[in-house]
Amino acid sequence: MMLKQIIQIFTIKFISVLIISFPSAIIADYFNIPLAWFLGPMIVTSIAALSGLKIIMPKIVLSFILIILGLHIGNYIDQNLFNQMLDWIWTSLIMLIYIIICILVVAKYLQKFASYREKASIFSAAPGALGPLMILAENEKTDLSQVATSHLIRLIIIITVIPFIVVNNTDSNVLLNDDFSYLAQNHLNLILLIIASLFFIFVFDKIRIPAALLSGTLFASGLLQITDIASYKLPDETVNFCLLILGSSVGCRFAEKTVKEIANNSLHSIVATTILVVLGLVAAYVATFFVETNILTLILSFSPGGIYEVAVIAIAFDLDPD
């Protein structure tokens, strides 16, 4: 399995992704499009996939990028973060209520107006990451095509709209610290962080903790950093490469979809996404009464998108990704 993943890196299907993604990212950046290194590749690969171009995102490449992303976010973890755990109780409670309301409202809409069956409507309405929901939907013998298409269209909308909202409400962008000497760091710390990350990813995956690649790396980074065993700051420029791969991976998910299939689900997916976003904004506003957190960070927290995509947006705009 691992050998197959490595071989895919050298196939024309993946090389094609890189060939079309880099120019699209550079062009998007030239025109100052928010989150250019994500949106450019995402849009171009989506169009390419729907046009019939054979493209693929090897799981091993995506996994590597998610570990890098986890190490980036790990720099935000310190003792002060754990002092805020009381606040998490309130936001977690609000999140639970938000998810329940989202599923009830959107599922009912999809059943009534889009003729979705009950199980398909529930999995399509859930504001979570596509991967885990697809696994649950498959176990329940649900229409995977409806669930996947609904979430992919939603992800495209969310990831396209959110950067424009953020950039119009903050002056921050990807922060580049030119004064920091990356080469002067103890590079052994990076090796320790990677080894610890791989260990906890394996453990978290075995005990079925969601998003093991990210959560395992975060746990390892936080543990080693708080205990002063190891810490390491990756160059901020690597965020752009993470953005490019994540954006391309979203587009590659359309490889097995048809334009007709997307068109048939587009209208209802747009309506469902609008409902989820409105409910998310309400939840974020309610959360401001319980926690002292940037409203944009809360909006991202209650955004009905994938955890990896939302986390990388937080990093790109210097918002608290935890």
Task: Give each language-model segment a name.
Residues 13-20, 77-108, 190, 240-241, ...:
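Entry/N-cap segments of selected transmembrane alpha helices
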Residues 129-132, 148-169, 279:
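Membrane-embedded alpha-helical segments of transport systems
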Residues 113-153, 294-322:
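Alpha-helical membrane segments and immediately flanking helix-loop junctions
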Residues 27-43, 62-65, 88-99, 120-125, ...:
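Structural signature of hydrophobic alpha-helical transmembrane segments
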